[in-house]
């Protein structure tokens, strides 16, 4: 039996200008444009291997060792679009194998908790789409491929690029102009770092999709956000990235996180993603910036309580020094020589704050999807390792 295989990795991205709200649920078209930073795959990534064979009678997906249902409309939409593009190639070249007619086996693994507010669906769908596009030898560029990833998970389209990325909401009803574009590559501003404080490993109470629908349907503040606040902030944030102006970038990032959680709170019933630990971390970062007399650290929170703190390499000792002072008992500091940190800060915070954080992930801006020589699939097109 002939088995065609391909593997790719894709990164997590963390939005600094938030995507929240759909204008078309089936196509995953957003109500506003968004911006994100792609994080290093050394710390957070999804690896996906795909196989196609004439002998595979159906599509199958294994996620983190377990066979999962492929009945999700989102996944089916991605596979259908990829097959359509492959069919176009096959119709123009009769010598290439008819992979579009074969079943595909998809094996995917994350190196971080799934559905814990760490953008697992973004990396997952990005890796899925890129690995199959690679298998199918599709000629489309990453912006074009991002439109397919978007149908799987809106924020997945931003994981198609490294560095600093914008998802342009577009205007077309068919979504043809709703795609990800590079604002600046990793090499433009390589000293951006991020500390992720994992506040909860649990699945969140209100999934993003249902939360968005509630906000769009019930929040008056949301309309103000998408019409007045985000369009200007989108331009200003892109400009701050191009100028490598951290103070402006950080200010806009924190304001947009707060704006996003404000519209969640303004929804009926209100949606609470931040917990007490999250709020104390927010206060800690504001105290740090106040002490420094300028913004050297910026928090952002997605649809969950986990904090992502952005800072520049040159301020690492000060920023991580304050975080280490209160979270030294939490795992995740192993990759850093903590003796280099400035822990002399007189900033006061709850000494029990560390109890609300399960681990810390120290990472930085990173590259986009990469082809991988590592494969999760054996020569029969089945997972090399399957959970019991």
From Swiss-Prot:
Q: Which Pfam families match?
A: MDD_C (PF18376), MVD-like_N (PF22700)
Tell me the GO molecular function terms. ATP binding; diphosphomevalonate decarboxylase activity
- Mark the transmembrane ranges: none
Residues bound to (R)-5-diphosphomevalonate are 19-22, 74, 153-158, 209
Cellular component annotations (GO), alphabetically ordered: cytosol
* Chain intervals for the UniProt region annotation (Disordered): 367-388
What SUPFAM superfamilies does its record include?
A: GHMP Kinase, C-terminal domain (SSF55060), Ribosomal protein S5 domain 2-like (SSF54211)
Its recorded reaction(s) are: (R)-5-diphosphomevalonate + ATP = isopentenyl diphosphate + ADP + phosphate + CO2
Paired cysteines (S-S): none
Q: EC number(s) on record?
A: 4.1.1.33
Metabolic or biological pathway: Isoprenoid biosynthesis; isopentenyl diphosphate biosynthesis via mevalonate pathway; isopentenyl diphosphate from (R)-mevalonate: step 3/3
Q: Which UniProt keywords apply?
A: ATP-binding, Lipid biosynthesis, Lipid metabolism, Lyase, Nucleotide-binding, Steroid biosynthesis, Steroid metabolism, Sterol biosynthesis, Sterol metabolism
Its GO biological process annotations read: ergosterol biosynthetic process; isopentenyl diphosphate biosynthetic process, mevalonate pathway
Record-linked InterPro entries? GHMP_kinase_C_sf, Mev_decarb, Mev_diP_decarb, MVD-like_N, Mvd1_C, Ribosomal_Su5_D2-typ_SF, Ribsml_uS5_D2-typ_fold_subgr
Domain of life, source organism: Eukaryota
User: Can you state the subunit structure given in the record?
Assistant: Homodimer.
What family is it from? Belongs to the diphosphomevalonate decarboxylase family.
Q: What does this protein do?
A: Diphosphomevalonate decarboxylase; part of the second module of ergosterol biosynthesis pathway that includes the middle steps of the pathway. The second module is carried out in the vacuole and involves the formation of farnesyl diphosphate, which is also an important intermediate in the biosynthesis of ubiquinone, dolichol, heme and prenylated proteins. Activity by the mevalonate kinase ERG12 first converts mevalonate into 5-phosphomevalonate. 5-phosphomevalonate is then further converted to 5-diphosphomevalonate by the phosphomevalonate kinase ERG8.
Designated name of the protein:
Diphosphomevalonate decarboxylase
